[in-house]
């Protein structure tokens, strides 16, 4: 399922996104965020994070740098004790 979601995002990036002006207020773009979130967390949690990110994309949100959160195992591995 995750690969199917990534395929849908890639389809959007390649064929639909070029038809409209660049409007993403975030870095990375919402579509790149979605791909990274799905790869890192899987289809369900990654899809949920992507949906939350897209819902933040409106004129009243300042935007800016909004990276995909680290997975808990990655955070534990890099934690300094």
Curated annotation (Swiss-Prot):
The keyword Membrane applies. It comes from the Bacteria. It is a peripheral membrane protein. It is found in: Cell membrane. InterPro entries: Membr_insert_effic_factor_YidD (IPR002696). Keywords: Cell membrane, Membrane. One of its GO terms (cellular component) is plasma membrane. Could be involved in insertion of integral membrane proteins into the membrane. NCBIfam families: membrane protein insertion efficiency factor YidD (TIGR00278). Belongs to the UPF0161 family. PANTHER family: MEMBRANE PROTEIN INSERTION EFFICIENCY FACTOR-RELATED. This is Putative membrane protein insertion efficiency factor. It comes from Geobacillus kaustophilus (strain HTA426).
């Amino acid at each position: 399922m995750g690969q199917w979601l990534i395929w849908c995002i890639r389809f959007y990036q390649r064929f639909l996104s070029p038809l409209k002006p660049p409007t993403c207020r975030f870095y990375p773009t919402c579509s790149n965020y979605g791909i990274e979130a799905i790869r890192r967390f899987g289809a369900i949690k990654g899809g949920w994070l992507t949906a939350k990110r897209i819902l933040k994309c409106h004129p009243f949100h300042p935007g800016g740098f909004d990276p995909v959160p680290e997975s808990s195992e990655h955070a534990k591995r890099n934690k300094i004790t």
